[in-house]
């Protein structure tokens, strides 16, 4: 049986008022969303980064890595021996995009909290690299320390959990604005080697694998009144969050039970199912887990089920995934999926954590249609 559900209902009083991103398919959130919506990817061979093992090394040459790599930014920061500098570079670009969209002017740093997910379980990278990351990040964005700066080394769903921490700090009055996000890149040879060795990376030798990617994304959480004071119309309201942990059975998996238990508390009896955004990345086990979970949820999800898995375009973006899904999800609710009132985001991390978060599409106080022509949406 899976671990006891740790659902924590969230009162719908904090909104997503701005987002920022940088990715292989966009220099900002708007470009990235446009590319993801159109299924336009930039996956390419990257032999200078890594070469995957051949099925028969004695008779076949190594195969160039196919990855979703950022090529529109200067690569001078991409030092194979200093991944923290590159991650800080990506984070700074996404942060700057958010800052511009948030319409901040003279907002003091002491009213802002920064929450960032960084990769865990990577060779020669961890908590000891946080000072280097933070120093470089502050230099690049040109800002001093914020009131709260919390960095968590985790996996695809970590940023969803950070939204809960940020919400708590907002309610406690420690901050007025919470900037939550993540940055990750698999494109370092010392990180790719063990993944390739263990048949995780997609190649001719291993068709059941994922395409490595790199991205950074941030979102701004605050009270609606704070956003409107700066002339912004919020994208969505944070409406709920849930978390469970997988406990493997004798068969080696939990048949999707933990994931289903993370999602169930966030599903209502409304006529239409929410838009689903997830971290499916091409690996068979993750797809099987979702298939099992879907069968358990069949009475709670009203057809047709709408599912978006951006890794098809961006590749697997690791610890940045949760923030990426939120940043894309709020836009999907106002464009491609306007008939859906909610977006449910779920992540199934390698560590066994199953995170889910619910967003409610924002409407004006009068209940009228969302104005796409002005304010924050679709800048």
PLM regions and their residue ranges:
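Acyl-CoA/ACP chain-elongation machinery
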Residues: 176-196, 243-252, 278-291, 305-341, ...
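Predominant activation on well-ordered alpha-helical scaffold segments within soluble catalytic domains
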Residues: 33, 92, 96, 131-135, ...
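Active-site pocket-shaping loop/turn-to-helix segments
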Residues: 73-96, 150-161, 204-217, 240-268, ...
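Condensing-enzyme catalytic core mediating Claisen C-C bond formation in acyl metabolism
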Residues: 9-23, 29-67, 74-75, 197-270, ...
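Conserved beta-ketoacyl condensing-enzyme motif
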Residues: 15-16, 40-153, 186, 266-301
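Active-site-proximal alpha-helical scaffold in enzymes
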Residues: 151-181, 214-230, 316-338
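Glycine/charged-rich beta-loop-alpha catalytic/anionic-binding loops adjacent to active sites
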Residues: 140-152, 196-205, 302-312
């Amino acid at each position: 049986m899976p671990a006891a559900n740790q659902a924590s209902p969230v009162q719908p009083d904090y909104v997503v008022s701005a987002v920022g991103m940088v990715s292989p398919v966009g220099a900002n959130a708007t470009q990235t969303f446009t590319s993801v919506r159109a299924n336009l990817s930039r996956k390419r061979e990257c032999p200078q980064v890594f070469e995957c093992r051949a099925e028969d090394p004695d008779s076949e040459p190594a195969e160039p890595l196919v990855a979703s790599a950022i090529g529109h930014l200067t690569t001078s920061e991409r030092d194979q021996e200093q991944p923290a500098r590159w991650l800080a570079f990506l984070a700074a670009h996404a942060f700057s995009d958010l800052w511009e969209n948030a319409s901040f002017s003279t907002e003091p740093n002491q009213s802002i909290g920064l929450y960032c997910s960084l990769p865990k379980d990577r060779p020669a990278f961890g908590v000891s690299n946080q000072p280097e990351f933070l120093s470089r990040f502050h230099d690049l964005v040109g800002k001093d320390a914020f009131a709260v700066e919390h960095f968590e080394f985790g996996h695809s769903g970590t940023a969803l959990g950070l939204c809960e921490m940020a919400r708590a700090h907002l309610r406690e009055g420690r901050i007025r604005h919470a900037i939550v996000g993540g940055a990750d890149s698999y494109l370092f040879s010392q990180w790719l080697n063990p993944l390739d060795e263990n048949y995780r990376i997609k190649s001719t030798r291993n068709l059941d694998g994922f395409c490595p990617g790199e991205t950074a994304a941030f979102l701004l959480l605050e009270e609606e009144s704070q956003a409107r004071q700066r002339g912004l119309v919020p994208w969505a309201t944070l409406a709920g969050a849930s978390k469970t942990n997988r406990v493997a059975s004798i068969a080696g998996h939990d048949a999707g039970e933990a994931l289903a238990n993370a999602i169930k508390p966030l599903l209502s009896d409304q006529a239409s199912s929410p838009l689903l955004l997830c971290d499916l990345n091409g690996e068979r086990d993750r797809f099987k887990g979702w298939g099992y979970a879907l069968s358990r949820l069949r009475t709670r999800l009203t057809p047709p089920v709408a599912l978006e898995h951006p890794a098809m375009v961006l590749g697997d973006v690791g610890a940045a995934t949760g923030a990426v899904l939120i940043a894309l999800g709020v836009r999907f609710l106002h464009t491609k999926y306007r008939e859906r009132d909610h977006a449910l985001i779920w992540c199934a991390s390698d560590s066994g954590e199953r995170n889910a978060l619910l967003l409610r599409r924002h409407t004006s106080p009068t209940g009228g249609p969302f104005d796409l022509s002005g304010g924050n949406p679709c800048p």
